[in-house]
Amino acid sequence: MFYQQQFDVIVVGGGHAGTEAALAAARMGSKTLLLTHNVETLGQMSCNPAIGGIGKGHLVKEIDALGGSMAKAIDKGGIQFRTLNSSKGPAVRATRAQADRSLYRSAIRDIVEHQDNLTLFQQSCDDLIVENDQVTGVVTQMGLKFRAKSVVITVGTFLGGTIHIGMENYKGGRAGDPPSIALADRLRALPFRVSRLKTGTPARLDARTLDYSVMQEQLGDSPTPVFSFMGKREDHPRQIACYITHTNSKTHDIIRGGLDRSPMYTGVIEGIGPRYCPSIEDKINRFADKDSHQIFVEPEGLNSIEVYPNGISTSLPFDVQFELVRSIKGFENAHIIRPGYAIEYDFFDPRDLKQTLETKFIKGLFFAGQINGTTGYEEAGAQGLIAGANASLQCQGKDPLILRRDEAYMGVLIDDLATMGTKEPYRMFTSRAEYRLLLREDNADIRLTAKGHELGLVDEERWQAFNIKLEAIELERQRLRDTWVHPKHAAAEALNPLLKNALSKENTLEDLIRRPEMTYETLMNVTEFGPGITDPKAAEQVEIQIKYAGYIERQQDEIAKSRKNENTLIPLDFDYSQISGLSNEVVAKLSDAKPETLGLASRISGITPAAISLLLVYLKKHGLLRKTERKTA
């Protein structure tokens, strides 16, 4: 039977991608259905209890700048906050928060349940309704049919999921949850390229059985960083410590002794695992010269006895897990509450997606999260928001939201996936962004919030707060440019001891902040020049904009040059074999990828600048040259 209400957007899956997708579509006014196999696990952290990190924190800030939920939820559920790379430049500084799983999940559910235009329904999705190569709805496990104009699939590791512990394996989406077999079969029957990936998780330990006195204590930052641009420190629950210990040569011997029963090393697991979050088996094999590896002992919550030993993900048999855990300093009497395991699952080649995350073969069908080959909550959430927004925009007949590589890490993420694909779980790093000085955590709102407000993703409260901050920055920068200090100025006596070289000529306050030894805060402490602006985030923005102005201007010049032909459209049915001078390999790659623009074509692996030049000349010669008119943020 058909459900009586028709929706604009249906989102399948209630994880990090699914919740952001459903919330985005609903915020934009689309009637949205979030279909999940269990409403109790909305926003569940299936692996490590943490949000953020290098590159990942940047994505969280961008999600937040567009009105998303992840940063708000971790501010309410974070039990330890740290700024990584705090001694380095602003481009690579990143926020990371340890999470209380229960508090984080509750925060996400609260946001979902109070979102207008969003309906929750608990059922697995077993089938898609596709008519004339366009998705028109879904069919649930009990045969109930829902109609919609767009469908977003965000099913994580559930598609054909198989859990491995030693040589034993069974079907599962994650420990304790069933897999999605029928939907996996349905998607495999469509013309998408499909393969398998693998990820894993460590055993969970009973905190009461660990000896913390022999471990290194790791405290959070004080004062604590705040993740959301709308957040405040008062949102944070009680803060607690993490701990650090290490594997040793005995641990490694135990692991080597169990490799003959490892599903990874006996060929049982075919999927490729994450390069940057390898299992402990992989670590001792790939880094055989190392006699120890670091383990972060992370609490799972304020009221939980479980800890997450980050660094010893494994799918070894339980008896080997037991021995290796107890060989570690501080874990000698550890009780394992849940065994570690690996999970193998289906993913679909993201080169079969448009930059909107809509599939190229089925109109109205969008993919987001691990189904596209990524790993990590943050990568999933970022894709979910973009997919949900574009599903809504398509329903409204509006131009899509496509973020460029120079505008957002979200743009880098999706561009990498759609143009180059991936053969292993994709993780975001700052090194993936060629314009990372412009894509800092601190300016995510300046880059994206205006666009979010225009699209309906950002509410009025956030918009007003953003404009107040922006005005404060602009007024303060003008004041600093207009205030001059002469060597004989009354404040010079207090100022000179703060400078490497005393004032010898007239300077503006902006000139003084450009000096390496001077900070905005230090200058404002000089009575004649302070107190400055009270919002620390606005003050930080003032200082960064002044100190890095030259570098930022150079990157903007580079972007202007590279963007010249970036948005030149290529006809979707274009026959590349018509172009004289293109090699068969290049013709095959371009025909296979079907890039929408010259910019996308240029980033396909193996496509040379010479090939792009030939393509551009052909398009000009045959009157096919036109720029995209779609909106990009």
From Swiss-Prot:
Its cofactor is FAD. GO terms for cellular component: cytosol. InterPro entries: FAD/NAD-bd_sf, GIDA_C_N, MnmG, MnmG-rel, MnmG-rel_CS, MnmG_C, MnmG_C_subdom, MnmG_C_subdom_sf. Gene3D superfamilies: FAD/NAD(P)-binding domain, GidA associated domain, C-terminal subdomain, tRNA uridine 5-carboxymethylaminomethyl modification enzyme MnmG/GidA. SUPFAM superfamilies: FAD/NAD(P)-binding domain. It holds the Pfam family GIDA. NAD(+) binds at residues 273-287. GO terms for biological process: tRNA methylation; tRNA wobble uridine modification. SMART domains: GIDA_assoc_3. One of its GO terms (molecular function) is flavin adenine dinucleotide binding. NAD-binding protein involved in the addition of a carboxymethylaminomethyl (cmnm) group at the wobble position (U34) of certain tRNAs, forming tRNA-cmnm(5)s(2)U34. NCBIfam families: mnmG_gidA (TIGR00136). This is tRNA uridine 5-carboxymethylaminomethyl modification enzyme MnmG. It comes from Pseudoalteromonas atlantica (strain T6c / ATCC BAA-1087). The lineage of its organism: Bacteria, Pseudomonadati, Pseudomonadota, Gammaproteobacteria, Alteromonadales. The gene is mnmG.
